[in-house]
Amino acid sequence: MQQRPIQFPALGIAPIHMPLFSHKVAAGFPSPADDYIEGRLSLDEHLIQHKDSTFFVRAKGNSMIGAGIFDGDLLVVDKSLNPVSGDIVIAVVDGDLTVKRLMKRGHEIFLKPENHRFKEIEFKDGQELQVWGVVTSTVKQFVRG
């Protein structure tokens, strides 16, 4: 039985342009005065480079906390990018999706977690690594609603 990848298409909604303040924020809030507005920023245009090849998926677990990816984070994944060593990728391992850092050591390719409590995933002869895409961004929510 051949498995077909599950598709997670980018959201097909019109961009919403929000104000981008030029004032840098250390521990306060910028004045809402128009003098500080640098321009307008659309998050989908900022986060998505290739609309037709981008999908979203939620992170599960804490194997990537060292890379700033936490349980429940929304990952922006571009499947048009060719993964290179050091990229964070979505891969299929033994039929399950995982997010890990793709690494190359000599001729060996492996997936590295960013949490010392987890082991590297090494591939033996005959095992296939299927990369679904490169993680380009994360979206974090601090207030659940």
Set out the residue ranges of the language-model regions.
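Short, positionally conserved secondary-structure boundary motifs
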Residues: 1-65, 97, 119, 126, ...
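Short, solvent-exposed secondary-structure boundary/capping segments
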Residues: 31-32, 109-114
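Charged, well-structured alpha/beta interaction segments
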Residues: 66-67, 75
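Structural motif
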Residues: 72-73, 87
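Hydrophobic beta-strand signal
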Residues: 76-77, 90
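Short, compositionally biased
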Residues: 85-99, 103-109
